[in-house]
Amino acid sequence: MKDGFLKAAALSPSLRVADCNYNASQIVSQLQDAAARGVRLAVFPEFCLTGYTCGDLFLQRTLQQGALDALQTVLDASRELDVVALVGLPLLVRGKLYNCAAVLCGGRLLGLVPKTYLPNYGEFYEKRQFTPGSTEVENVTVCGQEVPFGTSLLFRCRQMPSFVLGVEICEDLWSALPPSTFHTLAGATVIANLSASDETVGKAEYRRALVSNQSARLLCGYLYASAGHGESTQDMVFAGHDLIAENGALLAETSPFEGGWAETELDCQRMESERARNTSFEPSAEGYLTVDFDLALIETKLSRWVDPTPFIPHDERRRAERCELILKMQADGLAKRLEHAHAKTAVIGISGGLDSCLALLVAVRAMKQLGRPTSDVLAVTMPCFGTTHRTRSNAEILCDELAVSFTEIDIANTVHSHFKDIGQDESVLDVTFENGQARVRTLELMDTANRTGGLVVGTGDLSELALGWATYNGDHMSMYGVNAGVPKTLVRHLVQYEADIAVSAELRRVLLDILDTPVSPELLPAKDGEISQKTEDLVGPYELHDFYLYYVLRFGFGPSKIFRLAKAAFAGRAEYPDEVLYKWLRNFYWRFFAQQFKRSCLPDGPKVGSVTLSPRGDWRMPSDAAAALWLAELEQIPLKG
């Protein structure tokens, strides 16, 4: 449960209709197994103590008492278990029968939540036996314990306050205004649904969509435990279709009729983070009673998949769709700016590297969108001390294949003159040696844009902005930055996508060679004609930095949790032992804080995803903020050896 992780399970034991003792034994057996596996929240189906299909037997006092006796059996068994469990039963309160969920933990009955919406259509006749629950909470005595009864109940873990449980039952979710909506606005981060949803053609897909969409709307975790084998098949069949979703993502599911045990870890902190940044999510806890309970705070072993490349869809079709959409967004943003500025040209510094390649591809799309010739894109290559034949050749071929205007400005003489002006010793390959070239290139581009009535298109990407891997007022500056919202790992896939759809074999070949070229600013002299300065050797692997960037910006997680997630995501990768993950995480935080001043004056550029660093939009951070707290937390992370 540390770091907000909650191991949860939706369970569908095999039952016998109206055999409460047998059902209790099945539930206890599964509950004990779940607890042994580290499950801290176990949700069983609607009426699991009796069976859902008892019909008018629910009105029999013998069955009602049998359900209470079965509840006592489960309560007794739970005394030695560190788990919150929810079971369903009929309950007589003030002469009326209710369809209830009992919430229990450590032998204590925490509360009873009645069903709000009773279906009375098609195959369902619940109003024949039951009364809808009320939002008013009252105390009732059940199994010798005085407990709250009502729909406006929440259950909160003292040791992990981000785990707040709300409960609804089957049809409640299928209604126009589910109780879970109010539960989450009152503070619930996890919703448990005890269900007995019979199986019909197409219903599984609809059920899956309901659960996923509700968890997305409510920014919550959602467990759906449905009745399965053992229910009466007189007129219906039940498939034990169990689902667990989190913020719209389906994390675990059992196939209908394939057994009933869905298990995963929910991230309660993630849900809190989503709500904290969403101003449309307005809390309202009026009329709710919160019951506190205790669970031991231990580290939960992660079994849920942690995506090592959170910006990249893994399904090929979805990835292609995502790439096409992003390219259209980038092109549309640039097209609007070119149109508004009455720009005659789009001027791009082309190096033969990934970022400038993507910017050029976007500019070509923008011109086509505007109905203008691609020759209105002016690509400028500016070779200097570190330029290699490979990148220079690729730049020329790319421009020729895209039919854009091309010019070369050798900046070596200008840089020599500039170094002479400022007294820079050219044998000293320091930051001045590197940044001087970058600033001269920007000067050439800006003045070329002035001369041609054009607009300088920036090439820097989101990952470089996060790390500050750009020369202030050099490649950091442009008139419109089309890649500012695109992380480096995604840049590669966008260029790969353009290669995949390229009609020309030569265009495809050069794009693939650009993809195969090491990422480099080429500011230090080449060695034997090869790139001598490789970015990832200096700042670290971009796939790690993009992973860190995602969790820092998207959810505001701290270093220790991000390190834990990274270990899970990159497990089995020999090149990423814990020491390497730690080294580059520390480097990320140090650079991220130190380089904010560059992000405080960024050119305009389109937002394309949920993570971006525009100082006018998603990221407002003072340039002189201290990183001490984050670095101190890093120091507390234990490393083996």
Regions found by a protein language model. Name each.
Residues N23, P161-F163, C220, S232, ...:
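ATP/NTP-dependent adenylation/nucleotidyl-transfer catalytic domains that generate, transfer
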